[in-house]
Amino acid sequence: MSWQTYVDDHLMCDVDGQHLTASAIVGHDGSIWAQSAGFPQFKPEEITGIMNDFAEPGSLAPTGLYLAGMKYMVIQGEPGAVIRGKKGSGGVTIKKTGQALIFGIYEEPMTPGQCNMVVERMGDYLVDQGL
């Protein structure tokens, strides 16, 4: 199965009639493995900041999480495994696997819990596969 199939079929899937706004699977080095049509163009330093927060949980909290220049307020995640951000009526969930970062971006009416479920389920599957 291609990485694009994971994005199209497993991240951009229907959840109680709702869908993520955008999603992507990105290597730890910032290389895009696959992305949905609406995934924003991020900056390399934003991925560096995200990777630093996984290594040193809480490092993004004072400054916020930036993705494509948009600031998200960092909310409770799972240290070293999941970063969650909130911006207005939407937000982002980022799950770290051994080799990749799984991004899910949502807007209402999708809920943070629905986004978390989709992103973390995919991330857990990839971890189980050794990825």
From Swiss-Prot:
What cellular-component terms does GO give this entry? Answer: cell cortex; cytoskeleton
| Signal peptide bounds | none
* GO terms, molecular function: actin monomer binding
* A Pfam match: Profilin
PROSITE patterns the UniProt entry points to: PROFILIN
Checking Gene3D superfamilies in the record gives: Dynein light chain 2a, cytoplasmic (3.30.450.30)
TM region(s), chain numbering: none
| Top-level division of the source organism's lineage | Eukaryota
| Localization per record | Cytoplasm, Cytoskeleton
InterPro entries in the record = PFN, PFN_euk, PFN_sf, Profilin_CS
What's the main place this protein lives?
A: cytoplasm
Entry keyword set: Actin-binding, Cytoplasm, Cytoskeleton
| Assembly and interaction partners | Occurs in many kinds of cells as a complex with monomeric actin in a 1:1 ratio.
Regarding protein family, the annotation reads: Belongs to the profilin family.
- State the function annotated in the UniProt record: Binds to actin and affects the structure of the cytoskeleton. At high concentrations, profilin prevents the polymerization of actin, whereas it enhances it at low concentrations. By binding to PIP2, it inhibits the formation of IP3 and DG.
* Name used for this protein in its record: Profilin-1
